[in-house]
Amino acid sequence: PYRRQRQMCIRDSITISSTYIRTLVAQGEMERANQFLGHPHTLTDTVAHGKKLGGTLGFPTVNLRFQPGVLVPAHGVYATRVTFENGESRPAVTNIGVRPTVDDGDRVTVEGFILDFQGDLYGQTVRMEFYKRLRGERKFPSLEALKDEVMRNAEQTRAYFSTQP
């Protein structure tokens, strides 16, 4: 009988495995996880209707639903890239979490504010690539404070992608 042996991959005294990479993603350590994956961690789904609050604040978002068992990064705000069905892609600021400033519930959402984009993506399938965690999710004292922070996160995302190939 043959016994298949896997070759161990060790880097910086750490055994690199799918379990280790999943742990990195679950902790929001996207840059390190992506190094080991060889590509960005990605969620692909159909854009769903949300509460449209982002649009009223000046930040329309694409809302992704995800199936149970899908590996979603830790709650927080990320620099992401969204690719549309036509192949075009744009940087986005994406929040994963329970939206504590505007919701009292515990339903986890994935919402991406696509930078420099106007259009209707409802019903389209998009691919969202996660590159860097900008900050953890937090509750803001007002919608105005939330808007200011989204603007800062948008600038951080622009700066991040301006240095990437």
Where are these regions (language model features)?
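Short, flexible active-site loop motifs that bind/organize anionic cofactors or intermediates
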Residues: R11, Y20-T23, R133-G136
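Single conserved hydrophobic/aromatic residue that forms the stacking wall/gate
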Residues: P1-I10
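Anionic-ligand-binding alpha/beta catalytic cores of soluble enzymes and soluble regulatory domains
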Residues: I14-V62
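Short beta-strand segments in beta-sandwich/barrel cores
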Residues: M8, H41, V82
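Phosphate/ribose-recognition catalytic cores of enzymes acting on nucleotide-derived substrates
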Residues: G50-P165
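Residue-level marker of intrinsically disordered, low-complexity segments enriched
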Residues: I10-I14, D148
